[in-house]
Amino acid sequence: MSVNYATLGDLKKGSYIVIDGEPCRIVEMSRAKTGKHGSAKAHVVAICVFSGQKKSLVAPVDTRVQIPVIEKRLGQVLADMGDMVQIMDLETYDTFEVEKPGGNEEEEQLAAKLQPGVTVEYWLIMGKPKIIRIRSSSS
């Protein structure tokens, strides 16, 4: 599990954070200064990268939180196996299986285009791969 650490107050909308052991993208963040002797609090709403679930976190802004390290890599689709796709990394030539994207209309369209021989960009987040997009054949 590759993670870095940062202060919660330094994060912004669009950043990534680990909540309940799952990598999430921050979609909403607000800070509130509490009473006379209290510390400022941050309220974070994030969407899980893999499951799409909405997660919430309320903590002091000086709390150290985990930030997932995201490796952006290229791979080639070798086989379509129903709800899984076999991919070969184009740098290391390792082969592995990845779950097809799904959940919303955009991800369903991406899953429909996954054919053997297609080059895809995938992210390796905390040791787990996720297909992000199809690379155009011109690049």
Curated annotation (Swiss-Prot):
Modified residues (Hypusine): 36
GO molecular function per UniProt: ribosome binding; RNA binding; translation elongation factor activity; translation initiation factor activity
PANTHER family the UniProt entry points to: TRANSLATION INITIATION FACTOR 5A FAMILY MEMBER
Example GO biological process: positive regulation of translational elongation
Organism superkingdom: Archaea
A Pfam family hit: eIF-5a
UniProt family annotation: Belongs to the eIF-5A family.
Gene name for this UniProt entry: eif5a
Annotated function: Functions by promoting the formation of the first peptide bond.
InterPro entries, per database record: IF5A-like (IPR001884), IF5A-like_N (IPR048670), NA-bd_OB-fold (IPR012340), Rib_uL2_dom2 (IPR014722), Trans_elong_IF5A_hypusine_site (IPR019769), Transl_elong_IF5A_arc (IPR022847), Transl_elong_IF5A_C (IPR020189), Translation_prot_SH3-like_sf (IPR008991)
Residue stretches spanning the membrane: none
Gene3D superfamilies referenced in this protein's UniProt entry, alphabetically: 2.30.30.30, Nucleic acid-binding proteins
Subcellular localization: Cytoplasm
Keyword Ligase appears in the UniProt entry: no
Keywords: Cytoplasm, Hypusine, Initiation factor, Protein biosynthesis
GO cellular component terms given for this protein: cytoplasm
Name under which the protein is recorded: Translation initiation factor 5A
The keyword Membrane appears for this protein: no
